[in-house]
Amino acid sequence: LIILSTTNHKSIEPKKSFNRINKIKVSGLSENNNIKITEKLKQSLSKNIFFLKSENINRIISQFNLVESYTVKKVYPSEIKIEIEQTKFIAKISDNKNFLVGSNGKLIENENYNKSLPFLFGEFNSEKFLNFKKIIENSKFKFSDFKSIFFYKYDRWDILTNDNILIKLPEKDLKKTLEIAHKIISNNLFEDIKIIDLRIENHVITKK
């Protein structure tokens, strides 16, 4: 998401010196990351505020995976303000604990984030993962109900709940099978089960 706006602090004349960008202010991330983005922008952007193009700003900022969205404000005659919304961390990559998955679908190096997140196993595919997360959120489950998510190359998912119940899902009709799994887990008659296998259409297999 990009929002571009302008502010006129005073009347200006069409002189080159007035049009020159002499201040770029970036906010929203850590001080270190704000500085990195500022320096990159200073090196790459046009020196004239009137010739500044949003696609050039986007090309630079999109290199930083921590960014979820941002707004740009031109403060005439010579200042640019960029406010950044940091992406939310939603999962950890299982084979490399130094990387997190952002809500923007990008991988971010983990510097000091220690809060609990689901582990993602299998080859990471941003689009498929975000689509699957959306399906979960549209079911009666919450994404935070799971501590491990397994993705298989043939487009099938398994999920392990925080109560150590493994749900084996089919390749299709995920929302429907998630609803079935939720009903089983909510039923006291099945309180000791450890596996819910829903891979075969119209069949439910449970194991203790």
Model-assigned labels for residue ranges:
Residues N34, T38, S54, N58, ...:
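Extracytoplasmic/secreted envelope proteins and their assembly/folding machinery
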Residues K172-K208:
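Extracytoplasmic/luminal low-complexity segments enriched in Pro/Gly and acidic/polar residues
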Residues V26, Q43-K47, L117-N125, I165-K172:
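Second-shell loop/turn segments in exported
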Residues N19-I21, N32, N65, V75-E79, ...:
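Extracytoplasmic
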Residues L1-T7:
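Hydrophobic membrane-insertion alpha-helices, especially the h-region
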Residues H9-N112:
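Terminal hydrophobic membrane-targeting helix
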Residues N48-F50, A91-S94, F129-L130, K168-K172, ...:
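Solvent-exposed, non-transmembrane alpha-helical starts
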Residues K81-K153, I159-L160, L166:
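Extracytoplasmic segments of membrane-associated envelope/inner-membrane machinery
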